[in-house]
A protein has these predicted regions:
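Conserved thiamine diphosphate
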Residues: 8-11, 18, 99, 149-209
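Short, well-ordered beta-to-alpha junction loops that form the rim of enzyme active sites
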Residues: 49-51, 218-221
Length: 309
């Protein structure tokens, strides 16, 4: 069926309003739009790693989730979901479960790139019929904006503070999407909030209805941690893809597909400048730092294009 934005947006919300997420939070936007990939007749079981999303949307006895929701611990959301999915298959085989259920895990970059990576990797390698969705906001935002392995190089965080002896985080960010693609699972995709959400909506539905393991990495900007003007979130996302900092691509059964090639690739400073976490890079004498970021972005972009040939 051809994509229809109006029909997609008119689907019933599966995440209720009234939760405690910050105004303009990218994680909430990601969740609402991923869940729009579910067909109306299907139920979902959601597992969630500890993080902004979990502590703000589920505080017993209150929940913003209309589907079944499980929070276990920070590090084991992938294992929890794979266990529930395995139990469902066993019960379905015995005829004890009639309805169709889909299994979705949400985790931030801290619970996905770092603390929960081993349970994510295991679930993907075993090819459980589930979707792991990382809402990547580039740091441990819930506990005070500490750096994670998803934090970009030279970002100012509370554990990589900028000062006379530091220019922020010294390391490049981990390319987790490619790491998961190396697990040879049926579907891997990277996306964010662009194209009236068409890219996110279509990839979410593909991931949810792919047989076997699927992984979505969604760049979900955090106005508090990134220090940009809150209403500018969609502009920030568009700059991320137009500078090729956050390319849009899929890996379907091992085939690499680039979904968006900018007509005019913008310089990386266009993405960095609106964010307070990078303001130190625009002081005199810091030009070389921006050049290093640009060189890494260019290298990764060319590497991606070569994989998609």
């Amino acid at each position: 069926m051809a994509y229809n934005l109006k029909q997609t947006l008119n689907k019933e919300e599966r995440l209720s309003p009234g939760h405690r997420m910050c105004a303009g939070c990218g994680a909430t936007i990601a969740v609402r739009n991923v869940l729009r990939g579910l067909h109306k007749e299907d139920e979902a079981v959601i597992t969630c790693a500890t993080g902004c999303l979990e502590v703000s949307s589920f505080m017993y006895p209150y929940t913003a989730w209309k589907d079944s929701f499980i929070h276990n611990a920070f590090e084991n959301a992938g294992a929890t979901c794979s266990g529930v999915e395995a139990a469902y298959r066993a019960l379905k085989k015995k005829g004890k479960v009639k309805n169709t259920h889909k299994f979705i895990t949400f985790g931030g970059d801290g619970g996905t790139y770092d603390i929960g990576f081993q349970s994510l990797s295991g679930a993907m390698e075993r090819n459980h019929d589930m979707v792991y969705v990382c809402y990547d906001n580039g740091a441990y935002m819930n506990t005070g904006i500490q750096r994670s392995s998803a934090t970009p190089m030279y970002a100012d965080t509370t554990t990589t503070p900028v000062g006379s002896e530091s220019d922020g985080k010294a390391q490049n960010r981990k390319d987790l999407t490619q790491v998961i693609a190396a697990h040879n699972i049926p579907y891997v995709a990277q996306t964010t909030f662009v194209q009236n959400f068409k890219d996110l909506h279509t990839k979410s539905e593909k991931a949810i209805y792919t047989e076997g393991a699927a992984f979505l990495n969604v760049m979900a900007p955090c106005p508090r941690g990134w220090r940009y003007n809150t209403p500018d979130i969609l502009e920030i996302c568009q700059l991320a893809v137009d500078t090729c900092f956050w390319p849009l691509f899929e890996v379907i059964d091992g085939k690499w597909i680039v979904n968006y090639v900018p007509k005019k690739k913008l310089p990386i400073e266009d993405f960095l400048r609106p964010q307070g976490r990078f303001k130190h890079l625009f002081k005199p004498g810091k030009e070389e730092l921006i050049a290093r970021i640009q060189a890494e972005v260019d290298r990764k972009w060319e590497e991606l294009l070569s994989k998609a040939k």
